[in-house]
């Protein structure tokens, strides 16, 4: 009994009075986490007695349960388990998280009824195993409220050393909530949310990763018209972009050829303790968060969703459009959650003026390279709830169909040489074949006809003629990515446990002759909560006052 009493009060002291022997240098972070509760607990004898009674009742119930089940667990083993559990629950770090978006689904085909899904950049330092913990969500409508536990799914590469990673918080709530909150230790923070899209311009959505200091208008026009030709709809996220290019994209949006979405920087309005800059310490600038956001927006209305970069162009070689191409693969393998296309590097010649833009000449002068890259996914949104950059890290790879007879055209480089419009027209040949062309002649004619039709619009033509490819920020960003990831990973053979792929430390000089549009918003910091304080932004808008930054 003496050992029992001593161990019990060890646990009580650990939970309630860490100023005793447990409060030393090695356990200082534990002390700091519960110091807020310590004083009120010691000054309230009734609360102390209540805790002891509840604790003893729990021990008694546990022992009786073991006896009834004829399990030979000793009191020492039981208390050892309780002690380890207490230690595990208390050894967390106070961290911060940024909520990029939250959605409520009244009746989702895949998430269920009254489902909630939040995309959050979370710190891996919060818990030893982030996914083993739950988040309490409170949904309210009038005088009704419902508390539920939500799960955490982390989409990141194995052994990722970046402090912040993309996490999907998923749970259920009451019907048609007026308010959603996250609760911890009696403190709540209200979370802005919206419903997913109820319609789509196309059953095929091509999600384009967030753009920053984007200036290569030639890439954008190629991809916009190719996606449009094959029946897809582009959804593109923008952090910053050269203003003249942005103005042209807005015209395409008015034509319903694409949808532009905000991708604002994650900033913390206020904190009571030092915290690392999330944008500088998140994997790939939170690209997985943007792609998962696109998935959650369209998952109830799209049949297929693709995750591409702006320099990824897919031409369906054996079908007339994307829907036909993707349907043929998924119909043949109905249990598969996604299809996966590899990438082939190509070089294209530069076009200085939009007056010279021509798909037939661009493809005729295309240089197909031997080098390939890791590909991208097209998913069935009913079987996909979250994704990493190339594919989900949570779904079985043996249910991802790898397409072998078609490759994504990856525009690796726009050459310094000007597009030669006097060169003879010929179709580019698929690498490794002698006669199979990358694209059909009829498709090139259709692409050029579509572009010329758009170009005849006087509003479009006036804006498009102002576009200039400065080629100023692109080399800077390329070198930054090379120094921060590509060289360490591919040349020095370092893995993700040693490097955090992120280019936010790039120094981007400002030029008077280059103006950029930048996404921005109203930043909100919730009340300090343990173990996680939440932050977010509302009322996003486009700003031309920030400059050309990430």
UniProtKB/Swiss-Prot annotation:
<dbReference type="GO" id="GO:0016757">
    <property type="term" value="F:glycosyltransferase activity"/>
</dbReference>
<dbReference type="InterPro" id="IPR008166">
    <property type="entry name" value="Glyco_transf_92"/>
</dbReference>
<dbReference type="GO" id="GO:0016020">
    <property type="term" value="C:membrane"/>
</dbReference>
<keyword id="KW-0472">Membrane</keyword>
<dbReference type="Pfam" id="PF01697">
    <property type="entry name" value="Glyco_transf_92"/>
</dbReference>
<comment type="similarity">
    <text>Belongs to the glycosyltransferase 92 family.</text>
</comment>
<keyword id="KW-1133">Transmembrane helix</keyword>
<keyword id="KW-0328">Glycosyltransferase</keyword>
<protein>
    <recommendedName>
        <fullName>Glycosyltransferase family 92 protein R07B7.12</fullName>
        <ecNumber>2.4.1.-</ecNumber>
    </recommendedName>
</protein>
<feature type="domain" description="GT92">
    <location>
        <begin position="203"/>
        <end position="487"/>
    </location>
</feature>
<keyword id="KW-0812">Transmembrane</keyword>
<keyword id="KW-0808">Transferase</keyword>
<feature type="transmembrane region" description="Helical">
    <location>
        <begin position="46"/>
        <end position="66"/>
    </location>
</feature>
<dbReference type="InterPro" id="IPR052012">
    <property type="entry name" value="GTase_92"/>
</dbReference>
């Amino acid at each position: 009994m003496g050992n029992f009493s001593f161990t019990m009060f060890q646990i009580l002291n650990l939970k309630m009075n860490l100023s005793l022997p447990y409060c030393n240098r090695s356990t200082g972070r534990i002390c700091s986490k519960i110091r807020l509760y310590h004083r009120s607990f010691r000054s309230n004898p009734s609360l102390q007695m209540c805790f002891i009674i509840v604790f003893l009742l729990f021990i008694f119930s546990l022992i009786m349960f073991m006896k009834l089940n004829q399990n030979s667990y000793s009191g020492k083993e039981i208390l050892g388990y309780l002690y380890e559990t207490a230690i595990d629950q208390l050894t967390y770090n106070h961290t911060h998280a940024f909520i990029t978006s939250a959605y409520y689904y009244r009746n989702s085909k895949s998430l269920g009824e009254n489902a909630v899904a939040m995309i959050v950049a979370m710190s891996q330092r919060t818990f030893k195993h982030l996914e083993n913990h739950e988040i309490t969500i409170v949904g309210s409508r009038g005088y009704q409220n419902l508390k539920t536990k939500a799960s955490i799914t982390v989409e990141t590469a194995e052994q990722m050393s970046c402090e912040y990673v993309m996490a999907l918080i998923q749970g259920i709530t009451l019907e048609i909530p007026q308010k959603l909150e996250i609760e911890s230790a009696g403190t709540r923070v209200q979370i802005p949310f919206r419903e997913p899209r109820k319609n789509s311009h196309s059953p095929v959505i091509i999600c384009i990763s967030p753009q920053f200091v984007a200036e290569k208008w030639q890439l954008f026009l190629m991809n916009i018209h190719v996606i449009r030709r094959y029946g897809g709809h582009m959804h593109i996220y923008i952090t910053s972009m050269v203003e003249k290019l942005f103005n042209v994209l807005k015209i395409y949006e008015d034509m319903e050829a694409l949808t532009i979405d905000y991708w604002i920087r994650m900033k913390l309005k206020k904190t009571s303790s030092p915290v690392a800059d999330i944008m500088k310490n998140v994997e790939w600038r939170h690209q997985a968060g943007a792609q998962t956001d696109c998935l959650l927006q369209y998952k109830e209305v799209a049949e297929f969703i693709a995750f591409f970069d702006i320099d990824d162009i897919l031409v369906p070689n054996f079908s007339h459009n994307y829907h036909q191409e993707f349907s043929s693969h998924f119909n043949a393998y109905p249990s598969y959650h996604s299809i996966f296309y590899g990438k082939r590097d190509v070089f294209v010649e530069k076009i200085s003026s939009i007056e010279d833009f021509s798909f037939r000449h661009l493809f005729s002068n295309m240089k197909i390279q031997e080098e390939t890259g890791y590909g991208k996914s097209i998913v069935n949104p009913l079987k996909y709830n979250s994704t990493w950059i190339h594919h989900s890290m949570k779904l079985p790879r043996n249910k991802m169909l790898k397409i072998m007879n078609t490759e994504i055209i990856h525009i690796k480089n726009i050459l310094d040489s000007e597009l030669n419009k006097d060169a003879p027209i010929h179709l580019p040949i698929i690498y490794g074949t002698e006669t199979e062309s990358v694209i059909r002649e009829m498709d090139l004619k259709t692409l050029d006809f579509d572009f010329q039709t758009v170009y005849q619009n006087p509003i479009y033509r006036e804006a498009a003629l102002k576009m200039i490819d400065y080629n100023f920020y692109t080399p800077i960003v390329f070198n930054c990515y090379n120094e921060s990831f590509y060289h360490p990973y591919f040349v020095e053979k370092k893995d993700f446990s040693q490097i955090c792929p992120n280019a936010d430390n790039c120094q981007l000089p400002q030029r008077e002759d280059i103006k950029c549009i930048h996404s921005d918003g109203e930043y909100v910091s919730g009340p300090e909560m343990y173990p996680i304080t939440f932050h977010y932004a509302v009322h996003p808008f486009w700003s031309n006052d920030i400059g050309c930054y990430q």
